[in-house]
């Protein structure tokens, strides 16, 4: 689901760190 993925990506951005290190760091 692209909407869930998009929300997870937005929540996964912890500042200046690379996004791909936080693929399972999304909102739960």
From Swiss-Prot:
SUPFAM superfamilies: Phospholipase A2, PLA2. Keywords: Calcium, Disulfide bond, Hydrolase, Lipid degradation, Lipid metabolism, Metal-binding, Secreted. One of its GO terms (molecular function) is phospholipase A2 activity. Binds 1 Ca(2+) ion. It catalyses: a 1,2-diacyl-sn-glycero-3-phosphocholine + H2O = a 1-acyl-sn-glycero-3-phosphocholine + a fatty acid + H(+). It is found in: Secreted. It comes from the Eukaryota. GO terms for cellular component: extracellular region. Its cofactor is Ca(2+). Ca(2+) binds at residue 28. Expressed by the venom gland. Is not toxic. Belongs to the phospholipase A2 family. Group I subfamily. This is Phospholipase A2 pseudexin C chain. It comes from Pseudechis porphyriacus. The lineage of its organism: Eukaryota, Metazoa, Chordata, Craniata, Vertebrata.
